[in-house]
Amino acid sequence: MMRWGRKKPVSSSSSSGLSRALPVSWFSKLSGSSDLKPAKEKKQDEKASQNISVKTSLSSTTRRSDIHENSKRFQRVSVEKENSATRSADKESNEKFEEIMSSVRKKVRDFQKETCGFLEVEAMDRDNGTVILTPRIQVNRDKQRCERRDQRLLEQKPKRSEQDAGVKVKKPARRTGTGGYSREDSVILGHTITKPAHQWEKLKEVKLREVKLKADQQRKSLYLKRELNRIGTKENNKVRVFSPRASEKCRVKAIEDLKKAKQRAREHELLIETADGGMENESFAVVKCSSDPQKDFRDSMIEMIMENGINHPEELKELLVCYLRLNTDEYHDMIISVFQQVHNDFNFH
């Protein structure tokens, strides 16, 4: 039979053993859990510190790379600016030089068209050298020779005009591809043989006298014909060549021909003046045997600049035109390169 009531009391020994075991186990568990927690926290702290150090190192490397790239970019920009400035300066100087060269080439082409009949000086090899032409001041001997030639022409021309009663105005000699000019209008290496003013006046007076004589004869013949017609001869309504109108035309034509001849002589003088770059008319080309044409061209240009006091680009341009006209096409590139060097050395603006 079961008894209802209180439970049996537990013995004191068992209860004391449990009481001893329970606190120890709980403390050991608590201490174990407390020991585990700091270790985990330490690991987490170490990982966080490692991540932070990695991040800081990455950020520092990215900053350094950015700074390096920025410095490189700045250097590139500065170099590009300097290059663009030098390019613009070079371009400006090249444009100025090209402008000068284009005007010079145009003048040379115009001169070659107008003076295609200039006497050509053939290049000769002397001691394996090259013959070049440079402008110089003419010596007195050549000047005297040309003056004597002009005097002979002055003496010969009035005799011809007096002997030939029906003389006509002489047309200027045509210039052939390799031929020369007429004797009166010839141009020899920069010197022009021209007629003085008093000679032109004499020729003009002679021509006017001839025209007046012809007009008087025509008027007399016309008067005689009219008298014959009055007597009873058959009238003719056609305009005769002896009419005053025809004589007036002949007189005007003679004066115009004289003016044209004088104008041609003046044009030749102007051509030689422009060829000499504004220097004296009495200049000529010196034929020189050279083993180094480039050096000789440079020395000659510098000498001409110093002697004539050339200090403007226009005067230097005229000097270049003179060199290009005097020499053949094979030396033109060399002359232009030497001109560019001299232009840069003297710093013409």
UniProtKB/Swiss-Prot annotation:
The record's Gene Ontology cellular component field reads: cortical cytoskeleton; nucleolus
UniProt biased composition (Basic and acidic residues): 37-48, 63-94, 143-167
One Pfam family it belongs to: Ovate
Name of the protein in question: Transcription repressor OFP5
- Which tissues is it found in, per the record? Expressed in roots, rosette and cauline leaves, and flower buds.
Q: Per its UniProt record, what NCBIfam families does this chain match?
A: A_thal_3678
Query: What does the function comment of this entry state?
Result: Transcriptional repressor that regulates multiple aspects of plant growth and development through the regulation of BEL1-LIKE (BLH) and KNOX TALE (KNAT) homeodomain transcription factors. Required for embryo development.
Q: Name one GO biological process term.
A: negative regulation of DNA-templated transcription
